[in-house]
Regions:
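Bacterial N-terminal signal peptides
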Residues: 8-16
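Sec/Tat signal peptide C-region and signal peptidase I cleavage site
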Residues: 20-22
Length: 278
């Protein structure tokens, strides 16, 4: 009997580990080009209308507005046409960050209500999005383009519709203000005590698993403590910079970043189930 129980436990543990591995986003993709001159004004308006100060989205109301669904589609249409000369630098970065976030929002709106983006098939890997005359995936934008070009800075601004993501900002990124906007997004992310905690009295920080998953990106910029110290609140900045503390990585909540009830009770067990059986 003990051998049977041990075997069943081992099989269960293997299934758990495999499912959890599938639940972690991949880290590969192809480069994506984008044209210059995209107007982000309408996307900025939509973000201000449907995203609150906590970065949660009013998907229910947005889905009920045919005109604002159409407005999001028209915004994304700007990215679709084939181009001869792609843009570069901050214009490319700002446009692709906006494209990623807008495509995630459109994907959720198309499938709402849902409890998590992981309940939807191939959200990150499917080449279903039209940019510069070809089909690209969200992974192409993040891992094939933005991480190689702007490194650790990508991780505060790309929002994959999860409650543990950095908060979705209520503005569209622009070439002219991208550096300042990126800094602002980092500061707001690290100031959220439900997402990152600096416990100086205990010589401990409890931070997002993003800092573990993409450690190589932060190491290229001087390491996690340096980045934490750069953007943490003034009251804990010296402590964060020191690196003289234990690091705990918080469990990632993949529940939908919905202002309503969807995603609030999405569990780690449900995440594993969704990755095994969807």
């Amino acid at each position: 009997m003990n051998k049977i129980l041990g075997l069943l436990f081992g099989i269960g543990l293997l299934i758990f580990v495999c499912a959890l591995a599938r639940a972690q986003k991949s880290q590969s993709g192809e480069n994506v080009d984008v044209r210059g001159g995209i107007d982000h004004g309408e996307f900025d308006r939509l973000l201000k209308k449907y995203v609150n100060e906590q970065g949660l989205v009013d998907y229910g109301t947005w889905k009920g507005s045919a005109s604002d669904i159409s407005a999001l589609d028209h915004y994304l249409d700007q990215f679709a046409a084939k181009i001869d000369k792609p843009t570069q630098g901050n214009e490319k970065a700002a446009s692709l960050v906006n494209a990623y976030n807008a495509l995630v929002l459109r994907w959720i709106l198309s499938n709402y209500p849902t409890e998590s983006i992981w309940q939807l098939k191939n959200s990150f890997t499917a080449k279903r999005n039209d940019i510069a005359g070809r089909k690209v995936s969200l992974d192409d934008i993040e891992h094939g383009t933005l991480r190689p070009s702007i490194g650790y800075r990508a991780h505060a601004v790309l929002v994959c519709a999860a409650r543990s993501c950095p908060p979705l900002q209520r503005f569209a990124y622009t070439a002219e203000n991208f550096e300042e906007q990126n800094d602002r997004a980092y500061r707001r992310w690290l100031a959220r005590e439900d997402l990152n905690k600096f416990l100086s009295n205990e010589r401990k920080v409890e931070i997002s698993s993003i800092f573990k998953w993409f450690k190589a990106d932060f190491d290229k910029a001087g390491g996690v403590p340096k980045i934490l110290g750069r953007y943490a609140s003034q009251s804990v900045r010296e402590f964060a910079t020191s690196g003289n503390y234990d690091i705990k990585y918080l469990p990632y909540n993949w529940g939908l970043n919905d202002q309503g009830a969807h995603g609030r009770n999405y569990s780690r067990v449900q995440l594993i189930f969704d990755n095994l059986f969807k």
